[in-house]
Amino acid sequence: VDGYQVPINGAILIAERGSGAVRAYVGSSGYQDRSRKGAVNYLMAKRSPGSTLKPLIYAEALDRRVISVDQVFDDRPILVDGYRPSNFNNEYDGRIGLKQALLSSKNIAAIETLQKVGYEHLEAKYRRTFQSRGGGMETAGLAMAVGGLYLTPEELAETYLMMANDGVPASLAFETDHQLDEQSAFITAGAANS
C-alpha cells in the first residue's frame, strides 16, 4: 500500500479452515499514519461485503428446496418494489444455470433467490448465529444479495468458516487452545459443499 500516490490502507485476516485458528491478523497497514487513518482496525469496521454472501443465499435456498442444483434463472432486467437492480456490468445473459450465476456473480439470480428464501428469514437466522458479539445489525432487505448487509471482515470470515465447516457455525480462535463449541448446523453439509 505504500506504493500508491493516494494514501490507502489495507487489512488482512487469515484463519485455519477446520479450527478457526487465526494465523494472521493485521487491522491496518500503518498504525501511526494519520493520512490513511492507520489507528482504525479495519477488521472490526463494518463494511459492505459486496457479493460475498451470495453462496450463503444459494445454500439456504438449496436447504429450503426453493431452488435446485440444476436451477436455471432468467438473467434479465427486473423491477422489484420500484427498484431496478442490475448486474455489475449492466449486461444480461438470458437463461443461466445456478453454478454459472454464482461464478459470474449475477445479481438478478441472487436477488430472485433471496426473494424465494425470504430475506426476513435469512437475516433473522444470520443475526441469531453471527451477531452474538453485540453491535446492531441493520435490515438490508433484498440488498443483502448485493452487499447491503454491512459486516465486519471478522464476521464475514466466520461466515466462510461456517461454510467450510459443513454448515456448522465456527468462531475465530485467537488462542491456540480454543475449541469449537458444539452447535447445530446453520445449513446442511450438502448445501455448504455444493
Model-predicted regions and their roles:
Residues 7-15, 73-78, 173-184:
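Acidic/histidine-enriched alpha-helical segments
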Residues 32, 69-70, 98-99, 116, ...:
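Primarily short, surface-exposed interaction patches in extracytoplasmic proteins
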Residues 17, 32-33, 62-71, 133-136, ...:
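Secondary-structure transition/capping motifs at alpha-helix termini
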Residues 37-43, 94-96, 103-110, 138-145:
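Flexible glycine/proline-enriched surface loops and loop-helix/loop-strand junctions
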Residues 67-122, 165, 169, 181-194:
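Conserved catalytic neighborhood of penicillin-recognizing serine enzymes
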Residues 1-47, 51-52, 68, 120-127, ...:
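Periplasmic/cell-envelope proteins involved in peptidoglycan metabolism and beta-lactam response
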Residues 19-20, 39-73, 101, 156-163:
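Active-site SXXK
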Residues 132-186:
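Active-site-proximal helix/loop microenvironment
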